[in-house]
Regions:
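Generic, well-ordered alpha-helical scaffold segments in large soluble proteins
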Residues: 64-67, 71, 106, 185, ...
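N-terminal core-binding DNA-recognition domain of tyrosine site-specific recombinases/integrases
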Residues: 1-73, 89
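Conserved hydrophobic/aromatic pocket- or pore-lining residues that grip, position, or stack substrates
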Residues: 19, 38, 61-64, 72, ...
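Basic, Lys/Arg- and aromatic-enriched nucleic-acid-binding interface segment
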Residues: 51, 55, 70, 74-75, ...
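Short, solvent-exposed alpha-helical surface patches in well-structured domains
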Residues: 10, 40, 56, 81, ...
Length: 193
């Protein structure tokens, strides 16, 4: 199966910076790799990163070893019987009215003011803000439509930007009301360009 380029870049980074160096340090070759070796890797990683990060490592390892079985480099996938950590439930924290107003005061006039305000008020992701186009803002009907993203990643040692007209999830494609303060701020920004 195929994955998005940004996902591939993330997998490559995990493999080349974390996973492979760990096993190379222990001088463990692919054909010698055991379930216990992988389990020990997860335990070691849990001392420095979250369970969710280790779950991502597991996905990379499992997929790579599944491919190694497919091309007959190894006979069985040692990651198949590893107990991966349980996913941690995300508990978001939010600014209260005073905190958000303090933030807005601090960023007044900063080059990232518009981006930070869009993130804080509308909950836009970084890649949604970077991918925002003037055509997504309907000043007549006062709407803001999220339908384009730009994601940055490193692939083969090169920094690249990936533009996409598909969102992270179906619910990410959305149209929201453009409130008066943001309408005025965005119109002023557009006039300066």
């Amino acid at each position: 199966s195929t994955v998005k380029l940004t996902t591939y870049a993330s997998y490559e980074m995990m493999a080349t910076r974390i996973i492979i160096p760990y096993f190379e340090t222990l001088n463990i070759k692919l054909k010698e790799l055991t379930t216990e070796d992988i389990q020990e890797f997860y335990s070691a990683q849990l001392e420095r990163v979250s369970a969710n990060t280790v779950i991502h490592y597991h996905a990379v390892i499992h997929r790579a070893l599944k491919y190694a079985v497919k091309i007959k480099t190894i006979q069985a996938n040692p990651a198949a019987n590893v107990e991966r950590p349980r996913k941690e439930k995300f508990i978001g924290s939010f600014y209260d009215k005073k905190e958000i107003n303090t933030l807005f005061d601090i960023i007044q006039g900063h080059p990232l003011e518009v981006a930070i305000k869009l993130a804080a008020f509308y909950g836009l992701r970084r890649e949604e803000i970077i991918g925002l186009k003037w055509t997504a803002i309907d000043f007549e009907n006062n709407t803001l439509t999220i339908q384009h993203t730009v994601t940055e990643c490193n692939l083969d040692g090169k920094h690249i930007e990936v533009a996409s007209d598909t969102a992270k999830t179906d619910s990410s494609l959305r149209t929201m009301p453009l409130v008066t303060n943001f309408r005025e701020m965005l119109l002023a920004k557009k006039e300066k360009q």
